[in-house]
């Protein structure tokens, strides 16, 4: 078997295709969660915390600020060390939501698997030789003792 044939068999196996589909859907789902956090959750948190707070603009200057710059973009362009904790909080919330959804999906899949395992299998039909032996046994039991 040539290496090309081996690769073809490897690439078209069900698990590889399932993995590819999972990666594609995961990438799209990640964008949905990112939008949920950035466009819905963080603005709600901003309103709850008093309004006017944009977490992506929360930072601490770590060092000299020679021109007394105030915006994050200007500080980063000037090469000033900046600790952008607001961006980290946004990404952390994004991760927690994504991890929670994955946890719920795995839990649902495991529950469905358990239900399939718990379903009793239909008893296998008794083989003909065993049935015949049982008939003989029953006949011998019912036979009058001599």
UniProtKB/Swiss-Prot annotation:
Signal peptide: none
GO cellular component, one term: plasma membrane
Gene3D superfamilies reported in the protein's UniProt record: Large-conductance mechanosensitive channel, MscL, domain 1
Membrane-related topology note: Multi-pass membrane protein
InterPro entries named in the record: Mechanosensitive_channel_CS (IPR019823), MS_channel (IPR001185), MSC/AndL (IPR037673), MscL_channel (IPR036019)
Keyword Acetylation among UniProt keywords: no
Record GO terms (molecular function): mechanosensitive monoatomic ion channel activity
Transmembrane segments: 17-37, 40-60, 89-109
Keywords: Cell inner membrane, Cell membrane, Ion channel, Ion transport, Membrane, Transmembrane, Transmembrane helix, Transport
Cellular location(s): Cell inner membrane
Quaternary structure, from the entry: Homopentamer.
Family, similarity comment: Belongs to the MscL family.
Family matches, as PANTHER family: LARGE-CONDUCTANCE MECHANOSENSITIVE CHANNEL, MECHANOSENSITIVE CHANNEL MSCL
Function description: Channel that opens in response to stretch forces in the membrane lipid bilayer. May participate in the regulation of osmotic pressure changes within the cell.
NCBIfam families linked to this entry: mscL (TIGR00220), PRK00567.1-4 (NF001843), PRK13952.1 (NF010557)
Protein name, as recorded: Large-conductance mechanosensitive channel
Species assigned in the record: Acinetobacter baylyi (strain ATCC 33305 / BD413 / ADP1)
Lineage of origin: Bacteria, Pseudomonadati, Pseudomonadota, Gammaproteobacteria, Moraxellales
Gene expressing this chain: mscL
């Amino acid at each position: 078997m040539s290496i090309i044939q081996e690769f073809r068999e490897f690439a078209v196996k069900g698990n590889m295709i399932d993995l590819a589909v999972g990666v594609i859907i995961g990438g799209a789902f990640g964008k949905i969660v990112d939008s949920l956090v950035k466009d819905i959750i963080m603005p709600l948190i901003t309103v709850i915390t008093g309004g006017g707070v944009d977490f992506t603009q929360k930072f601490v200057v770590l060092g000299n600020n020679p021109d007394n710059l105030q915006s994050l973009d200007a500080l980063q362009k000037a090469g000033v060390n900046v600790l952008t904790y607001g961006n980290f909080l946004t990404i952390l919330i994004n991760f927690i939501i994504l991890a929670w959804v994955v946890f719920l999906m795995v839990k649902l899949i495991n529950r469905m698997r358990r239900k399939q395992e718990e379903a009793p299998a239909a008893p296998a039909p008794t083989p003909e030789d065993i049935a015949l032996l049982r008939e003989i046994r029953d006949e011998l039991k019912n036979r009058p003792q001599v």
